[in-house]
């Protein structure tokens, strides 16, 4: 195919605060739409847990000032202390239960949200045009499903609840501190300001590196995927050392960004802890001085102990929030990549002409039917009067002065004009980059043309729904892709409602039945690893069977016999000949001997048709085709 190189991943700029807020808002919208009540229950559990913590801290004031002092003076007994602690014990037990329920709920919310996001990702990915997959590394896309989605799981199930828990705790503890001593509370806020400024600075430094880390991780995964797919090519050309060198460069970029991100992130915890200790010491010193100076009037011993406990409960959530900032920033970087994929425009389709099962009356009238009759027709609605007309599908394809380029800057097909009559075999030959595969990509509308018209049975293909257009076209490719499943499942992929008998009949037509029955479990043999336990020729025979079971009126055979031995090629060719019988067929082949019997051979060079005619006519012209054929040149 003529086109630009696939990119492993574009550089990711540092996200602004506004962009981070937008992504977080969008993510939480997904959570609220699916798990609103569970999330509300989580908030309630957080409030209960925070309340239990505060009650525990404030009880220390009464413990020292009322009960310990009272027991020493003889005004209180141990029984009074036990009675006072029983309600506290119930509150603390309730806090433990609430914390447990919160954890269970967030696991459910987190995993459920990931299920929703993965489903949305895959559903949307299936709607994307081929252009997207031609220009994006498959490994990078896989990294979105694995690494980026997993960071979102951690964000939803851990980071966000922790931040909410810390925020609620801070607010509740603040009012408890204010109730205890407003003077000491102001002092704590002043000390907290320095802690927040230091945390914000460090989070800013680490944030940009976390974004780069996610992007570099996608590039590494993309490179690994490419090397795994092309491992045979790597070994044939002894490219192992170069591949290791390239991987080392990408891996070093990942290490550098991860090191920088974690270097600053890991500094946050110790700094916050030390600042919290300093705040505790200063508050203890000032509180002690205040208690001594006022004789316990403004700050009793119990009130001081309670305040210091609250101060610890106040600074600890702040420290937790700053520590979670790194996870949040990294998760938001992953979320941006997830949403970038979800925001990719789906494949546009303005077609309205449908392909339907039909039957023909003796007078030639075509009517639609729900039964599979072997006769197909185009259903053409007319908006002017609301009527519907039917035209029998015959398989005629016309190119009328077609120009096309994968990018607006570069046209790769120039003024392509041709006509394939129903049932004809049209062959494309030419050198690498001549435009042969590009033409077939235009027939099934993997790409849309910039100029000219393509008609299918005299209908502009832009008016035909893409799904119906592609249903009418069978494809057999050189690089046959088989899916994990049985042989029967892989044949049935051509038509999901096909019976076992129909699949076996298609295999017989493709000359595949004989080798299939010799497999360990015959048609029920499980294929894995893209059919790695089959030969290239056997895989192509299955591909032919898959196309045969779909029973399409038109075929595209893209280089289908270029990498198999002569004996297997004979089997494959017989299968293809049986499949092509009565169908309009477009063939691209390396070996010109396979297209000698074509009704018309198109010779392409630099995106232009320079010769056309039958094999004998082109040989007689002694032009480019003659040179390719007599010189045993390979046409790709």
Residue ranges and their predicted role:
Residues 25, 44, 98, 146-191, ...:
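Hydrophobic alpha-helical transmembrane segments of ABC transporter permease domains
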Residues 13-21, 45, 52-68, 91-138, ...:
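Juxtamembrane helix-loop junctions of ABC transporter transmembrane domains
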Residues 36, 130-131, 147-156, 160, ...:
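An intracellular "coupling" helix at the cytosolic face of ABC transporter transmembrane type-1 domains
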Residues 37-98, 178-183, 285, 292-301:
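Transmembrane helix-loop-helix hairpins at lipid-water interfaces of multipass membrane proteins
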Residues 5-15, 111, 119-143, 147-151, ...:
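Short intracellular "coupling" helices and adjacent cytoplasmic loop segments at the cytosolic face
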Residues 71, 176-190, 260, 264-336, ...:
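Helix-loop-helix
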Residues 74, 358-636:
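ABC-type nucleotide-binding domain
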Residues 1-53, 68-87, 102-106, 110, ...:
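Membrane-integrated ABC transporters
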């Amino acid at each position: 195919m003529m086109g630009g190189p696939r990119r492993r991943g574009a550089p990711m700029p540092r996200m602004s605060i506004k962009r981070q807020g937008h992504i977080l808002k969008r993510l939480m919208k997904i959570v609220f739409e699916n798990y609103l009540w569970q999330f509300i229950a989580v908030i309630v559990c957080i409030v209960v847990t925070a309340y239990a913590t505060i009650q525990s801290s404030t009880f220390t004031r009464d413990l020292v000032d009322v009960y310990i002092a009272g027991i020493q003076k003889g005004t209180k007994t141990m029984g009074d202390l036990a009675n006072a602690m029983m309600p506290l014990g119930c509150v603390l037990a309730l806090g433990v239960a609430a914390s447990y329920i919160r954890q269970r709920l967030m696991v459910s919310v987190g995993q459920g949200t990931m299920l929703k996001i993965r489903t949305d990702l895959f559903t949307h990915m299936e709607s994307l045009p081929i252009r997207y997959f031609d220009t994006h590394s498959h490994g990078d896309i896989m990294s979105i499903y694995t690494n980026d989605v997993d960071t979102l799981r951690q964000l939803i199930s851990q980071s966000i609840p922790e931040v909410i828990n810390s925020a609620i705790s801070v607010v509740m503890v603040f009012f408890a501190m204010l109730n205890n001593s407003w003077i000491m509370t102001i002092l704590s806020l002043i000390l907290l300001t320095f802690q927040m400024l230091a945390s914000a600075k460090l989070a800013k430094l680490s944030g940009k590196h976390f974004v780069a880390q996610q992007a570099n991780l996608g590039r590494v995964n993309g490179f690994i995927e490419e090397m795994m797919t092309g491992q045979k090519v790597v070994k044939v050309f002894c490219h192992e050392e170069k591949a290791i060198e390239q991987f080392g460069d990408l891996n070093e970029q990942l290490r550098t960004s991860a090191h920088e991100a974690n270097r600053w992130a890991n500094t946050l915890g110790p700094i916050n802890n030390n600042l919290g200790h300093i705040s505790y010491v200063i508050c203890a010193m000032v509180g002690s001085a205040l208690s001594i100076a006022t004789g316990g009037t403004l700050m009793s011993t119990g009130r001081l102990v309670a305040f210091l406990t609250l101060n610890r409960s106040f600074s600890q959530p702040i420290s937790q929030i700053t520590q979670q900032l790194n996870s949040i920033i990294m998760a938001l970087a992953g979320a941006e990549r997830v949403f970038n994929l979800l925001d990719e425009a789906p494949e546009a389709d303005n077609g309205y002409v449908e392909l339907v099962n039909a039957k023909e009356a003796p007078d030639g009238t075509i009517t639609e039917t729900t039964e599979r009759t072997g006769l197909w027709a185009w259903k053409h609605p007319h908006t002017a009067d609301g009527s519907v007309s039917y035209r029998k599908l015959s398989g005629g394809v016309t190119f009328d002065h077609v120009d096309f380029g994968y990018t607006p800057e570069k046209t790769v097909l120039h003024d392509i004009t041709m006509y394939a009559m129903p049932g004809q075999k049209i062959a494309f030959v030419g050198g690498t980059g001549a435009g042969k595969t590009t033409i077939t990509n235009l027939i099934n509308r993997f790409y849309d043309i910039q100029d000219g018209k393509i008609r299918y049975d005299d209908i502009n293909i832009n008016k035909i729904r893409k799904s119906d257009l592609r249903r009418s076209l069978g494809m057999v490719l050189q690089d046959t892709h088989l899916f994990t499943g049985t042989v029967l499942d892989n044949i049935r992929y051509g038509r999901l409602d096909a019976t076992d008998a129909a699949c076996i009949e298609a295999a017989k037509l493709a000359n595949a039945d004989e080798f299939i029955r010799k497999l360990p479990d015959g048609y029920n043999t499980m294929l894995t690893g893209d059919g790695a336990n089959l030969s290239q020729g056997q895989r192509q025979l299955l591909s032919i069977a898959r196309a045969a079971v779909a029973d399409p009126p038109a075929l595209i055979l893209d280089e289908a016999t270029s990498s198999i031995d002569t004996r297997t090629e004979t089997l494959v060719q017989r299968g293809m000949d049986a499949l092509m019988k009565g169908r309009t067929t477009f063939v691209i082949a390396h070996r010109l001997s396979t297209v000698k019997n074509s009704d018309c051979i198109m010779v392409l060079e630099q995106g232009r048709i320079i010769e056309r005619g039958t094999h004998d006519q082109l040989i007689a012209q002694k032009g480019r085709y003659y040179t390719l054929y007599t010189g045993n040149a390979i046409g790709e």
